């Protein structure tokens, strides 16, 4: 039942097209060229999620938070951890660079992500828009710091040491054996074989959009409230959907 509600909400949050008869379109103001670019490059990704990622990225740029960006990473935490749910795009060359497995936090859920937190010590993942920062070597090896841009949802990421890193518990073999990936303490961990390349691609100011159909975030994130104030916001669409289990932490 939970998955069906989650799928329903993801379907409702559309860009440019109403999800069901009588429901308004979400974002007439989205840069359709960016959305089209992402959708063409990653046909396996949920177009609704890509549309929201495009909206958030353009909003961040419109607000003057970024001078420009060449790469965008999208994580769809509504998918099980056994499926590729991280996409990394080269926006200059208009192509998909990576389609990868990515782990979520230990207390976020088992195979499915269900709970998110911005609190130190929660060992949960955080949703929202991030900007990448510098790299360093830590207890998990080569790692990429992430600066959370969504107040109340991920803006404690630096303090929590939420970083991208490689991990031995992220692999197709682990997914096949356990029916899920291993879990981090909240970090978006990737396969060790690709970690350095992915990190070097994203370091130094790229955007990372971590999605989950959380009604509060969709209603409150400043990155869904940019140009085209008359356009229907995600919160207006979410209000018509069946409730999801509450996030904790």
Model region roles, listed by residue range:
Residues 189:
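Short aromatic/basic micro-patch
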Residues 1-5:
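N-terminal secretory signal peptides that target proteins for export/translocation
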Residues 10-21:
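Bacterial N-terminal signal peptides
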Residues 23-25:
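Membrane-interface motif at the C-terminal end of an N-terminal transmembrane signal
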């Amino acid at each position: 039942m939970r998955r069906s509600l989650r799928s329903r909400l993801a379907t409702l949050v559309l860009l440019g097209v109403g999800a069901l008869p009588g429901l308004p379109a979400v974002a007439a103001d989205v840069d359709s060229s960016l959305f089209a670019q992402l959708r063409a490059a990653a046909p396996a990704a949920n177009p609704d999620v890509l549309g929201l990622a495009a909206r958030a990225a353009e909003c961040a740029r419109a607000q003057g938070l970024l001078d420009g960006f060449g790469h965008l990473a999208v994580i769809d935490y509504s998918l099980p951890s056994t499926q590729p749910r991280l996409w990394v795009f080269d926006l200059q060359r208009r192509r998909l660079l990576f389609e990868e497995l990515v782990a979520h936090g230990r207390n976020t859920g088992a195979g499915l992500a269900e709970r998110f937190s911005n609190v130190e010590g929660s060992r949960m993942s955080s949703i929202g828009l991030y900007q990448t920062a510098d790299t360093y070597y830590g207890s998990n090896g080569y790692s990429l710091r992430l600066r959370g841009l969504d107040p109340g949802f991920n803006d404690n990421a630096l303090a929590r040491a939420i970083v991208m890193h490689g991990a031995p518990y992220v692999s197709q073999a682990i997914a096949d054996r356990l029916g899920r990936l291993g879990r981090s303490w909240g970090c978006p961990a990737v396969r060790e074989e690709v970690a350095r390349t992915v990190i070097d691609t994203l370091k130094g100011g790229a955007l990372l959009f971590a999605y989950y159909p959380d009604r509060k975030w969709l209603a409150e994130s400043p990155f869904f409230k940019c140009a085209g104030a008359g356009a229907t916001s995600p919160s207006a669409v979410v209000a018509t959907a069946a409730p999801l289990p509450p996030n904790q932490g």
